[in-house]
């Protein structure tokens, strides 16, 4: 049996993260402070971690969970496309002349169709703005026709946003509870 500890994201620029969440947590938070922790100051080290640092870390892990959910949904035939390729997209937005990214991409290589998603591990955010940016980013993923847009969030979206998404027919909301519903 082989285990992959380090994974390279499918993207334009090289990015390596530990595929195993335990190793990732250890090398991100424990190893830099191992002397303090072993010296008995573990509680102080933990209390010194800001909500922002933990939120950023959990946000990256949340993206991975969302991608895994898309894979499982595709295998079960519950996605609107038959996706077989999963990952992220990073690159330059020529209109803004800056780096941009798409948190999750699920693609059907045969039909050249894909869905893209934004993953928000925050208590609140501008839902309309996030959806507008997601639609803009569809033009950045070259070689695929983006047909569906997913907004993954820690908490449920507002009723107004959910109503707009349902009316669009191509936008879907997935909450943390939804991610674990079929397990």
Q: What kind of feature is each model-predicted range?
A:
Residues 1-7, 12:
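Single conserved hydrophobic/aromatic residue that forms the stacking wall/gate
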Residues 14-183:
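A cross-kingdom feature that marks ATP-driven nucleic-acid transaction machinery
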């Amino acid at each position: 049996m082989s285990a992959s500890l380090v994974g390279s994201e499918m993207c334009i620029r090289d990015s390596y993260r530990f595929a195993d969440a335990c190793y990732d947590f250890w090398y991100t938070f424990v190893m830099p402070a191992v002397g303090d922790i072993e010296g008995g100051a573990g509680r102080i080290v933990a209390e010194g971690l800001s909500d922002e640092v933990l939120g950023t870390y959990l946000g990256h892990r949340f993206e991975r969970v969302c991608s895994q959910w898309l894979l499982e949904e595709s295998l079960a035939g519950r996605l609107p496309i038959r996706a077989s390729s999963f990952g992220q997209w990073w690159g330059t937005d020529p209109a803004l002349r800056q780096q941009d990214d798409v948190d999750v991409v699920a693609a059907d290589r045969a039909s050249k169709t894909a869905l893209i998603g934004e993953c928000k591990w925050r208590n609140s955010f501008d839902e309309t703005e996030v959806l507008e940016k997601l639609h803009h980013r569809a033009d950045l993923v070259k070689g695929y026709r983006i047909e569906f847009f997913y907004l993954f969030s820690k908490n449920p979206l507002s009723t107004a946003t959910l109503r707009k998404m349902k009316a669009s027919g191509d936008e879907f909301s997935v909450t943390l509870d939804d991610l674990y519903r079929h397990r």
